[in-house]
Amino acid sequence: MQAPQGQLFNWNPFYKIAGGNYNVQIYGPSGVGKSVLIQEMATTMLSHNVRMFILDIGKSYENICKLLGGEFIRFGSGSGISLNPLSGLVDESGKLKEAILEDGSSVPIKTIRAGEKEYYVSLDGVMYAKNIITSMCGAGNNPHKEALIEDAIYRAIEQCGSDLTISKIAEVLKNGNGIEKELGETLLPFTDRGMHGKYFENAANITFKERITVFELEEVAKDETLLSVLMQVVAIQIFMQVLCGDRSQKFMLVVDEAWRALDHSEKFLAEMSRTIRK
């Protein structure tokens, strides 16, 4: 990389000292070149075979993504994009368990038995899914409601296996009483009957096959709850693909304009930054 006056210097975000991790925050006033710096980092990382995923608001990375032959994904009216946050959460083939055992990773796995079938889930994946649904319900920082949502996820897995959707989680909750029923009703906008259901109900149709993928969220940025949920859903999809894929492949997830998600996703972002290093 180059310093402002053209001096060459070396910086490796994958170099870890002692008990540290690989997380990086970039701060600075508006217009000083934060996105330009990240673009430079992206091109450098790609030259070292690092896969790049960038969540952006404002099309700062559209040109560089297309120039590098990446996948530019725009969320908005008519985009036809679907990201079921529960897609890939449940594994019934044992692939997830085998991948983690082969890797020697410390990622915790839970086995759920439903009749004669066994399903495997990453507890980190369940935690992320719970946080996403918590954001949808506006139930953040309420341990009781979060526990009810987590229990509903497990009950839905027992009933539906790997065929999970937000609508099915909502039905499980609505079959309960009191707070559970209220949570299920609050999920309506994100179900197949709601205005945001188009983003979450169908199977995920994004492949993540390119070396660099940019998710442009400017068109949904005014709806803070939807923006927060979409950012979390994209992050969990990336996490599950990395978890079940080639564990030797390095990747970098960039959340530009992350401050916009802090009011609704601070817990999710904090927990992901702590666990993704595993």
Regions found by a protein language model. Give the residues of each.
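P-loop NTPase motor domains
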Residues: M1-F9, Y15, K59-I73, S77, ...
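Active-site-adjacent "gating/activation" loops or surface patches in catalytic cores
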Residues: M1-T43
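Alpha-helix capping and helix-loop boundary segments enriched in small/acidic/polar residues
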Residues: N21, P29-L37, N49, Y120-D124, ...
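Generic beta-sheet signal
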Residues: Y22-I26, M52, I212-T213, F251-L253
